[in-house]
């Protein structure tokens, strides 16, 4: 079932085209805070810290939000990280993991309430089987783009209400998912998928009085329009449009006094056959709005046509371990059906790029493999499996990503590219605050980095900061360098060499 572009889809299209200006503020700063939702009422801050510290020790603070009056948990909290890269990885690993029997729903914290309440990128899914949880709902829709959050609505006893919500990063993913998944049979139930529209927006969009009527007979007059639509309410004007010679253009407009009458007229008269002509009745729009709808419909049908051509048989696999080759990749997916082609992409020197493609003989086999293999640990990495995108869809996706770059990892200081001989290396052990390197980085090497170079007879004055930590070893291009013994009380930041 195809979702026809309407007023709600048109609104999404306009937001998609100006997304670069809407979301600019989101990317000014790195995101270090994760929102943890759907927490059990008994979860405390210590429980949350213990759960996340199993994955990383890069945690700066933990907070479980409680009611100000009763002190009871509100069912959500926050975890702050020192590095945004650690926050992103923790979200990917721990999202939907259980804490005290309930799966956590994790996403980046959004401090701007206008963005939280905008409903941008949201999809409404109903007629879900009661056995489908948040994780399974996310797996169903992750093939259409980056998913920020998934939630299945439940009653007080924890039983599914049969509907849920999926929030995408890109609005393009919204109507692609709606057209591909709407009417799909999932666990013996046909699900209904559509863009989420708040009750306020829905009511506001229905407030109109002017109706457009197309495919009239050439002999139709203004009086015929009034007679045809008069039963639905009082009409203020009705006109059949004519060309310069006075001939009917076979369409016209009917303006009602009340909006309810206009809505009823569309519902009752659209598709009705009058004088052997099937009428098309809808809300009257400006020419610019109609042009946007036609463009949106064309772009949407092109994407759906390409997806139907491929029939969802080609899968895109990323985050592959370097040890995975064509044979290994085929072995991983062979249990789900007949594989027609399998390829791991490599660089010119033969090293794996960490991505590949697997094409099945049927879309059912590909869907089964995607649901089962997405997030599965292969080697030491979880692989991510989605439907391979057509060229045009991939181009639009890249354009969206370019306009909305994700938060970049925390940048470490980059030192000079020049490699100094060992005799020129500083013989002073860096203290905290002066070229100090955290213990988590000891024995490792940052890309494009080398030890700081000591310039003879020159030292940048730095205030002395006493520390309780022992000095960390210098890290060279090939690991830790041998450290000279440093006698106590000989360190002087103002000393000249």
Swiss-Prot record:
Highest taxon listed in the record's lineage: Eukaryota
UniProt-annotated location(s): Cytoplasm; Nucleus
One Gene Ontology cellular component annotation held by this UniProt entry: nucleus
Keyword entries, A-Z: Cytoplasm, Nucleus, Repeat, RNA-binding, Translation regulation
Gene3D superfamilies: 3.30.70.330
Similarity comment: family membership: Belongs to the polyadenylate-binding protein type-1 family.
Protein name: Polyadenylate-binding protein 1
Organism: Arabidopsis thaliana (Mouse-ear cress)
Gene: PAB1
């Amino acid at each position: 079932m195809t979702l026809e572009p309407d007023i709600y889809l048109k609104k999404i299209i306009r937001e998609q085209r100006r997304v670069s200006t809407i979301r600019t503020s989101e990317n000014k700063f790195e995101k270090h805070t994760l929102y943890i939702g759907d927490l059990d009422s008994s979860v405390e801050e210590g429980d949350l810290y213990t759960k996340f510290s199993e994955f990383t020790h890069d945690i700066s603070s933990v907070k479980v939000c409680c009611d100000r009056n009763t002190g009871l948990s509100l069912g959500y909290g926050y975890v702050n990280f020192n590095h945004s890269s650690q926050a992103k990885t923790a979200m990917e690993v721990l999202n939907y993991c259980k804490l005290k029997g309930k799966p956590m729903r994790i996403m980046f914290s959004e401090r701007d309430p206008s963005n939280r309440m905008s409903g941008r990128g949201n999809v409404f899914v109903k007629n879900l089987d009661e056995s489908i949880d948040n994780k399974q709902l996310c797996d169903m829709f992750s093939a259409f783009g980056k998913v920020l959050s998934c939630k299945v609505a439940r009653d007080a006893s924890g039983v599914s209400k049969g509907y849920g919500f999926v929030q995408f990063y890109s609005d393009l993913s919204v109507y692609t998912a709606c057209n591909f998944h709407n009417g799909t049979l999932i666990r013996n139930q046909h699900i209904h998928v559509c863009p989420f529209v708040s009750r306020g927006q829905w009511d506001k969009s229905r407030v109109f009085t002017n109706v457009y009527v197309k495919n009239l007979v050439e002999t139709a007059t203004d009086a015929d329009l009034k007679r045809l639509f008069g039963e639905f309410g009082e009409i203020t004007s009705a006109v059949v449009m004519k060309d310069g010679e006075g001939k009917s253009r076979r369409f016209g407009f009917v303006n009602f006094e009340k909006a309810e009458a206009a809505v009823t007229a569309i519902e009752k008269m659209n598709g009705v056959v009058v004088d052997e002509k099937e009428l098309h009745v809808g809300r009257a729009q400006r020419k610019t709005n109609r042009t946007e709808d036609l463009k949106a419909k064309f772009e949407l049908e092109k994407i759906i046509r390409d997806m139907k051509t491929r029939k969802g048989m080609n899968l895109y696999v990323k985050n592959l371990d370097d040890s995975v080759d064509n044979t290994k990749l085929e072995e991983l997916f062979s249990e789900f059906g007949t594989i027609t082609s399998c390829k791991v992409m490599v660089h010119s020197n033969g090293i794996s790029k960490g991505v590949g493609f697997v094409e099945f003989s049927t879309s059912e086999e590909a869907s089964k493999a995607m649901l089962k293999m997405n997030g599965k640990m292969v080697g030491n990495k979880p692989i991510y499996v989605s439907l391979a995108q057509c060229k045009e869809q991939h181009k639009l996706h890249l354009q969206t990503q370019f306009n909305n770059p994700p938060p970049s990892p925390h940048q470490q200081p980059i030192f000079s590219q020049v490699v100094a001989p060992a005799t020129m290396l500083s013989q002073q052990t860096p203290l905290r605050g002066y070229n100090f390197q955290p213990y988590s980085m000891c024995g490792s090497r940052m890309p494009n980095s080398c030890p700081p170079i000591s310039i003879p007879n020159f030292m940048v004055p730095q205030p002395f900061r006493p520390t309780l930590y022992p000095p960390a070893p210098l890290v060279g291009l090939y690991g830790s360098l041998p450290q000279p013994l440093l006698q106590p009380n000989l360190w002087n930041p103002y000393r000249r060499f």
